[in-house]
Each structure stands twice: as structure tokens, then as C-alpha cells.
């Protein structure tokens, strides 16, 4: 059974160096693939120098980095929402985009042809009507003085 398994790689007399752009070098020793020596360059010496001159009471606390070029930082400005032409209508369309959009379109159609508001509600929220174009037959239908609105719930 041991003959079927592949053996360890042949020992290599050369030390393998892997070039790195971050200043970290890795070297693998002779045939030992588990132990890797990592040398880290002193790129973080600036942070270590800052930590060295701090008092013991300041160590471990978070500090804000200060940009020497900037004289001071202005507080973040609150940007108000854009002003809308019709704030009430646009707010309703934004919050309720499906059924109320059709309802508002029907109200606009009702304002131009002046038929009872109850018919607009009936057309918009009745399951058999799906489009605002369903209002057109109601607009062309004559209105009677004895007409009473019927609300379906």
C-alpha cells in the first residue's frame, strides 16, 4: 500500500525565494513545505514611531489621523431632498407606486371631465378594472341627477 502513495518531493539544496511587491519575502527550506520563513520589511515603521512616543495612558486608544495639509475640516453638510413641482402628488406616487398611481391618474381624468369621485374610486379599486383607460366609457356616459354613488368593499 505504501508503494501506491506518492512520496515527499526530493530534497532541494537551493533555497527558494519568492519575489513580492509588498516587501515580504518567503523562503522555503530544504524539502520542508510546512515551515516557511516570512521576513517583513519596515514599511510600518512610521506607525511604530508614533506608538513609541505615546504615553502609557494613550496606548490602545483609537486616534484620528490628522491631515497636516488641511487647516481644518468642515462638518458634513446636510443635503435637503430635491424640491418637487407637486410635492403632495409626487410623495404619494413615491410611497405607493402601484394602486395609488392609478388612483391619482383617475383623479386627474376626473378633474378634466368632472364626473363623481365615487366612480373614480369604483373604477380604480374594482378588481375587474385594470387600466385608467377603463374610465373612458364612464366619461362618455350621461350623468343623471338621481345617480347615487355605489361603493364596493
Curated annotation (Swiss-Prot):
Residues 1-88 are annotated as: Disordered. It comes from the Viruses. This is Uncharacterized protein BLRF3. It comes from Epstein-Barr virus (strain P3HR-1). The lineage of its organism: Viruses, Duplodnaviria, Heunggongvirae, Peploviricota, Herviviricetes.
